[in-house]
A protein has these predicted regions:
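Conserved PLP-binding catalytic core of the aspartate aminotransferase-like
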Residues: 227-278, 283
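A generic structural motif
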Residues: 65, 193-196, 243-246, 304-310
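Active-site C-terminal subdomain of aminotransferase-like
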Residues: 84, 104-233, 242-245
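Long, low-complexity, charge-dense
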Residues: 72, 192, 207, 211, ...
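Conserved PLP-enzyme active-site core in the AAT-like
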Residues: 1-155
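Conserved alpha/beta core surface patches that mediate binding of polyanionic ligands
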Residues: 165-172, 215-221, 266-289
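Short glycine/proline-enriched loop/turn "hinge" motifs that connect secondary-structure elements
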Residues: 23-25, 51, 177-181, 285, ...
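PLP-dependent enzyme catalytic core of the Aspartate aminotransferase-like
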Residues: 283-329
Length: 329
């Protein structure tokens, strides 16, 4: 896109992975950050407005953000992008494997963004990364292009290689030039044992992880000391201690405190992570909050093991107890 239209920018949601901003700097291309809706997804009205008033060449949509696990409204967003002539890249690095759950034999999950996962096939390019749900180490990701001839824009020549074929070689179109085949071989072996099937292998695993996340979220909603930010669409759950005041500063302090107390408990530690959200995104998720600072931390749990469902109630109960102790102190 930069080679054909260097004046165009790239649009991403404010919850998109931080590496998109980094690549914008590498490409020396302006990045446009778009707001999100009450479910942490790219806001469609903001997307259309940006396309109307800003020269945007590419829109990045995310199938499972790493912060909230949210799936952008991919189907509707692609339709808007086609209307304005913008190409679409889908970042399916984290949530792409949840596409396996769209099958007659797969378990049914109410509210699962089925149409958005189906629409991934309509994108111009898709990033996939088996180092997460594909059970692989780093180095086993790739980008798939609908039109393979775009490889010519990435081509770089060498005076002593690439003479064996008229087709573009991977080394000619990648930044790394050469890549070890071990990661691809390891993925092949893994998928022989755990196939890409909806009720077996990887499909069964991601289905169990989604169920674990929903179970975790259900337990949060049953406890007054904790507040769920948005129902999980993948296996990531974002939540916060119910603050003693409806302000971002109170949420930030309570989240930091609960995170540290839970992790550092010598007898019964609970390991979570913190996720920092800008004020506009967090107040959109939780309209009852007042933005008295620019951002705030919330808690984030990733249920990437099917076994997590078994312990969800116990762990959430432990977090709720610690949160109540903080409030009562």
């Amino acid at each position: 896109a930069r080679e054909l239209h260097p004046e165009n920018s790239i649009a991403v949601s404010e919850n998109a992975h931080y590496t998109h901003e980094r690549m914008g700097q590498v490409l020396d291309t302006e990045m446009v950050s778009l707001p999100t809706d009450a479910r942490g997804r790219l806001h469609l009205d903001a997307l259309e407005e940006a396309l109307q008033h800003t020269p945007i060449g590419t829109v990045v949509l995310t199938a499972g953000t790493t912060g909230l696990g949210s799936v952008d409204p991919i189907a509707d967003a692609i339709a808007i992008c086609r209307e304005y002539g913008a190409r679409v890249h889908v970042d399916a690095a984290y949530g792409g494997f949840f596409r396996l759950l769209i099958h007659d034999d797969a378990p049914s999950f109410d509210g699962f963004p089925e149409e958005d996962f189906r629409a991934i096939k309509e994108a111009d390019s898709v990033a996939i990364d088996p180092h997460k749900h594909g059970l692989q180490p780093y180095g086993c990701g790739c980008i798939l292009f609908r039109d393979p001839t775009v490889g010519r824009f990435y081509q770089h020549d060498s005076p002593y290689t690439y003479f064996t074929s008229d087709d573009l070689h991977l080394g000619e179109i990648s930044l790394e030039c050469s890549r070890a085949g071990a990661a691809a071989g390891a993925l092949w072996c893994t998928l022989r044992a755990l196939p890409l099937e909806p009720t077996d292998g990887v499909g069964a695993i991601v289905g169990a992880c989604l169920q674990a996340a929903r179970t975790w979220a259900d337990h949060i909603q049953d406890r007054d000391a904790l507040t769920l930010l948005t129902p999980p669409e993948t296996d990531i759950v974002a939540y916060m201690p119910t603050p003693d005041a409806p302000t971002l500063s109170a949420v930030d302090a309570a989240s930091q405190s609960l995170f540290e107390r839970a992790m550092n408990d010598p007898d019964d530690p609970v390991f979570t992570s913190l996720y920092r959200l800008p004020a506009d995104a967090l107040t959109t998720l939780c309209p009852q909050l007042q933005a008295d600072q620019d951002e705030a931390a919330v808690l984030r749990s990733v249920l990437m093991k099917p076994e997590h469902k078994t312990y969800a109630g116990e762990l959430v109960d432990r977090l709720a107890t610690l949160a109540r102790e903080e409030t009562d102190a």
